[in-house]
Design a protein with these regions (language model features):
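Aromatic- and charge-enriched surface segment that lines or borders ligand/interaction sites
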Residues: 104-150, 175, 310-312
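Extracytoplasmic/peripheral linker and loop segments enriched in polar/acidic and small residues
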Residues: 40-45, 427-439, 467-536, 558
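Periplasmic binding protein-like
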Residues: 54, 129, 275, 419-479
Length: 558
């Protein structure tokens, strides 16, 4: 089983976590230089067995990754060993159908409607012995299409465009018919959830709160130990594909500030160092570790929570963006890792490494304190206090910015933002949140549960940017934390999702993005590489970037 590094919905991370025509040649959105860095070795060159200790920032609170509480990188990392998906991205970031589950997928027009026919691997089964098949596809669609609002969802995109999911010519064929064209159809059913989980809203929302009861991957769930702070998976004896090299994978929760010591002491086998220059320096100085780097769809940003009396005025949001020298921040924070390549990110949708990338920031992209002041005065913030902070009547121009503990890079970013914003008369109040509480209410959680004003975190994207990112901007979507958007933006993204011409899709998505920059939905800071420090004895694991992980091949060299 090969699992997408990131599934269709974007994932939150505190770790510091198409084809142009309808076909399977994609992704047309990926650039040609998206190489991974994983120390590739043939399975025959590896020791058979062993336990890989995979660090996570916290225990997963909800193992259903399609449910908002499970929309976390640490949950996806665990479930990627167990959940089936229809395709993956190989070492060249090219889409490939996963023959462990789908032997072929063909798209056609039937009575004028887009129709996808999946031929399933007849050997595929869940750990309860039930065959992987139509019931799972139907259940996944029913749970995720938005028809029944009791199913709490991270995203309905793609599924809401499906008209029917039916049996094909035999029991191993599934036919999906769309109501209207959906360009990123290859992203749908990644993953496929078991019918037992999708049987009812109660099952969907609660059944996997303490652990996944079923697997159809090379590993199966064993236990979660809240004292040891670990989740363990082991080889799935019912797995029909290539035998995994490893016996077990332990996902161990370690605060980020303590991860480099744990890695150097051999307690874990890797850590993400992309947001911790101190860890990079120490890892590079160790003869036991390898630092691996790959371009990746990860971007740091300042996102507004539900708007307040201060942040509801778009002129205030625009002024904050204008007050920031995002390039200086990028070079200060990312320069030690990326060198001269460190730069600000100017596109919410298409990051560097994806086709259609362009600068959509307009007149807000470069620091302009004078213009920031002008917009603040137009918004009524004309009084300047002795401390340099502006006010409008009794309302002080103050914004609380939350950030997670144990993250040096984020702490430094917040200090830079605070200093630069003050030059325009905006008070940024840094508010440290324990990392274990950062992605739970009332902090960075799906709308309307998150109650923060402004937060610093990263979105981890993937190779289907239009369909996945549109969910972050759609009004009413739980992932649009501040509900900043418009009907015009929704319409542009909807059109981009429902046509096949790549050039037209890109233009529509970029037009939507330009509107969102003017609305200051969020302030994109910089794109981070996938940078990890790994035990030198580990093979087929590391910086995956835009490619997928094959958990059957991960292991230790002889």
């Amino acid at each position: 089983m090969i699992t997408s590094k990131i599934r269709k919905a974007l994932l939150l991370t505190v770790s510091l976590g198409l084809a142009a025509s309808i076909g399977v040649s994609g992704p047309a959105n990926a650039a040609s230089d998206n190489k991974n860095d994983i120390n590739p070795k043939p399975a025959s060159a590896l020791k058979q067995g062993g336990t890989f200790v995979h660090v996570v920032v916290d225990l997963c609170p909800q193992f259903n990754t399609g449910q908002p509480a499970g929309n976390l990188l640490n949950c996806s990392q665990v479930m990627n060993t167990m959940l089936p998906g229809v395709n993956y991205f190989d070492n060249k970031a090219t889409l490939v159908w996963d023959a462990n589950y789908v032997t072929s997928a063909k798209v056609s027009k039937v009575k004028g409607k887009q129709t996808v026919t999946y031929d399933l691997n007849p050997k595929a089964v869940w750990t309860n012995g039930r065959k992987f098949g139509l019931k799972d596809f139907v259940g996944t669609w029913n749970a995720r299409n938005g028809t029944n609002k009791a199913y709490e969802n991270t995203s309905t995109i793609g599924y809401e465009d499906i008209e029917s999911v039916k049996k094909g010519a035999n029991d191993d064929q599934v036919v999906v018919t769309y109501k209207k064209t959906f360009a990123d159809w290859q992203a749908v059913f990644n993953p496929v959830y078991p019918a037992e989980l999708t049987a009812s809203p109660d099952a969907w929302n609660k059944l996997w709160l303490t652990g996944p009861t079923l697997s159809a991957g090379p590993f199966e769930y064993v236990t979660t130990d809240k004292v040891a702070r670990t989740t363990t998976v082991k080889r799935n004896p019912k797995w029909w594909g290539d035998k995994p090299v490893l016996d077990r994978v332990i996902f161990k929760a370690v605060p980020q500030v303590a991860q480099i010591d744990a890695l150097l002491n051999g307690e874990i086998d890797f850590m993400d160092v992309g947001n911790d220059i101190n860890a990079v320096t120490r890892a590079r100085g160790s003869d036991k570790l390898r630092v691996q780097i790959a371009k990746a769809p990860i971007h740091e940003h300042l996102t507004f929570g539900p708007v307040t009396a201060v942040t509801e005025d778009v002129r205030v949001r625009q002024a904050l963006m204008l007050s920031l020298d995002r390039r200086l921040i990028a070079k200060t924070i990312q320069g030690p890792i990326m060198g001269d390549a460190a730069a600000e990110n100017n596109n919410h949708v298409f990051l560097d490494g994806l086709y259609c990338n362009q600068d959509n920031t307009g007149d807000l992209g470069k620091q302009n304190v004078a213009e920031a002041v002008k917009r603040l005065e137009a918004a009524g913030y004309t009084t300047v206090g002795a401390d340099g902070i502006r006010s409008k009547g009794s309302q002080r121009l103050s914004i609380k910015l939350i950030y997670p503990s144990g993250n040096v890079n984020r702490a430094n970013t917040v200090l830079l933002v605070q200093a630069q914003a003050k030059a325009a008369g905006i008070e940024i109040v840094p508010t440290l949140i324990p990392s274990a509480q950062y992605f739970v209410a009332p902090n960075v959680t799906s709308w309307p549960n998150g109650k923060y004003e402004l937060a610093l975190f990263a979105w981890v994207g993937g190779n289907y940017p239009i369909s996945s990112v549109s969910n972050l901007h759609k009004l009413g979507s739980p992932q649009n934390h501040g509900q900043i958007g418009s009907a015009a933006v929704d319409a542009l993204f909807s059109r981009a999702n429902n046509i096949l011409d790549l050039q037209k899709r890109c233009k529509l998505a970029n037009d939507a993005d330009k509107l969102q920059y003017q609305a200051v939905h969020s302030i994109t800071m910089f794109q981070r590489p996938n940078a990890v420090a790994v035990n030198k004895k580990v093979a087929n694991f590391g910086a995956f970037g835009f490619t997928s992980i094959d958990w059957t091949k991960v292991g230790f060299t002889k």
